[in-house]
Regions:
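Small cysteine-rich, disulfide-bonded extracellular modules of the LU/uPAR three-finger superfamily
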Residues: 1-93, 97-135
């Protein structure tokens, strides 16, 4: 999987360390699914909040001692079944700070996915399937 930090996150980190601007950690982080991948500066096209879609909470992360600039999700993430219609082909995902589709700020994004979610299809990320890198 490829991907990157969003410009929003990079700016927040710089402001925090260089200007003493406090960034308040969100209560939860959410993973969303995209039919057009976001980039560092664009939002992409997220699956809309219809047909059973809702971003999923992903608050548990593991940091590696050998690669401390990376974090991975620690548990299975399962989206509800797509019903009554499918969501299309999922090509990317993103971690954001808000629950609603298209809301909040993208913090990190990842591409390299290619999964068609048809009627009653379910999207999942196994534990350790999402790797975020601070580079």
């Amino acid at each position: 999987m490829g991907g990157s930090n969003s410009d929003f996150k990079e700016i927040a980190v710089l402001r925090h360390f260089l200007l003493s601007t406090v960034y308040t950690q969100p209560a939860h982080l959410y993973v969303g699914l995209y039919t057009v991948a976001p980039t560092d500066s664009t939002a992409g096209t997220e699956v809309p909040n219809t047909n059973g879609y809702v971003r999923q909470i992903v608050d548990a992360w593991t940091f590696s001692g050998t690669t401390p600039t990376q974090a991975q999700n620690t548990s299975l993430i399962t989206f509800p079944a797509a019903t009554p219609a499918g969501w299309g082909t999922i090509v990317a995902g993103a971690i954001s700070d808000a629950l609603g589709s298209g809301s909040g700020n993208i913090l990190d994004w990842f591409d390299g996915l290619s999964q068609l979610i048809g009627i009653n299809g379910v999207a999942e990320f196994l534990a350790n399937a999402i790797t975020l890198t601070q580079d």
